[in-house]
From Swiss-Prot:
Monomer. This is tRNA dimethylallyltransferase. One of its GO terms (molecular function) is tRNA dimethylallyltransferase activity. InterPro entries: Dimethylallyltransferase, IPT, P-loop_NTPase. Catalyzes the transfer of a dimethylallyl group onto the adenine at position 37 in tRNAs that read codons beginning with uridine, leading to the formation of N6-(dimethylallyl)adenosine (i(6)A). ATP binds at G8, P9, T10, A11, V12, G13, K14, T15.
Length: 305
């Protein structure tokens, strides 16, 4: 038995295509999106509509509040529990989403995280504040392999890697290698040519604005959720917050959301290219109807193995 993970960049059309595919084969969708896990954040995360969720049951959406902590290890545990529930009911589970880190957690495994230590994190943040760039140098010295995989500007993951090293004396890159992979999964990636994908992203952002993204952000802030939360730094939310604070005008806000989403989509494609065994479908060149038929066949046949 092989379970499909259908990934790809934002706005490529995963949701619409997979709703139809899963409806016809009697499958249920397990969301693989690190932002759709949050309640109250609907428009900016492009959650499936209530009508779509009626057509095909979805899991791993709206599971925590915006101020709650969540990580890839927790996602793996919770989503596998959801998968087993779907299997017990005689249905086909299909993972759908664009969060590559979650795909990694499923396929390659993830070590059981070392508990967070706020004292260490506070010390590291203060060190970085006093001497910008010092944490990057420390990471390159203590864990060169992790340094090659963590972007120089990704302070959060840099601090986490150093925290693990300081608490255990072991490199996070070594611990991650000890994690057990799971051969029950196979990966399908939906993509489009850059010009078409970027056009779709621009249109999606315009639609989000029309649907009330600004009001959604205002409502979240009104509920007491801080702009400094990880959830509120999601693309679309952070730009609206800066707009509401008067840092730039409305048109600049829209421009930045589009630009940042395009950059994010490019990073997603790069991430999924790491899966050498993945099956790719380029929706710019392939007929979408034919791709849907191929997906149905591929998902069902692999599930029946």
């Amino acid at each position: 038995m092989k379970i499909a993970i259908v990934g790809g960049p934002t706005a490529v059309g995963k949701t619409d295509i997979m709703i139809e595919v899963c409806e016809e084969i009697g499958a249920e969708i397990i969301s693989m999106d690190s932002r759709q896990i949050y309640r109250y954040m609907d428009i900016g995360t492009a959650k499936p509509t209530s009508e779509q969720r009626r057509r095909v049951p979805h899991h791993m959406i709206d599971i925590i509040d915006p101020d709650e902590y969540y990580n890839a290890f927790m996602y793996r545990k919770d989503s596998l529990r959801a998968m087993e529930d779907v299997l017990r009911r005689g249905k086909i589970p299909v993972y759908v989403g664009g969060t590559g880190l979650y795909a990694d957690a499923l396929v390659r495994g993830i070590f059981e995280g070392v508990p967070a230590d706020e004292n260490i994190r506070k010390e590291l943040r203060e060190l970085e504040r006093r001497e910008p760039g010092i944490l990057r140098k420390m990471l390159e010295e203590f864990d060169p392999e992790a340094a090659t995989r963590i972007h120089p500007n990704d302070l959060k993951r840099t601090i986490r890697a150093l925290e693990v090293y300081m608490k255990t004396g072991r490199r996070i890159s070594e611990l991650q290698k000890e994690a057990k992979g799971d051969d029950r999964f196979f990966i399908i990636v939906l993509t489009r040519e850059r010009y078409e994908l970027y056009e779709r992203i621009n249109k999606r952002v315009d639609k989000m604005i029309e649907m009330g993204l600004v009001d959604e952000v205002k409502r979240l802030l009104g509920m007491g959720y801080s702009k400094d939360l990880n959830s509120m730094k999601t693309i679309g939310y952070r730009e609206v917050i800066d707009y509401l604070e008067g840092k730039y005008d409305f048109d600049k806000m829209v421009h930045l959301i589009k630009r940042n989403t395009r950059h994010f989509a490019r990073r997603q494609i790069i991430w999924f290219k790491r899966y050498k065994e993945a099956v790719w479908y380029n929706l710019t060149f392939e007929d979408v109807g034919e791709v849907k038929e191929k997906l149905k066949k591929l998902i069902v046949e692999n599930f029946s193995v």
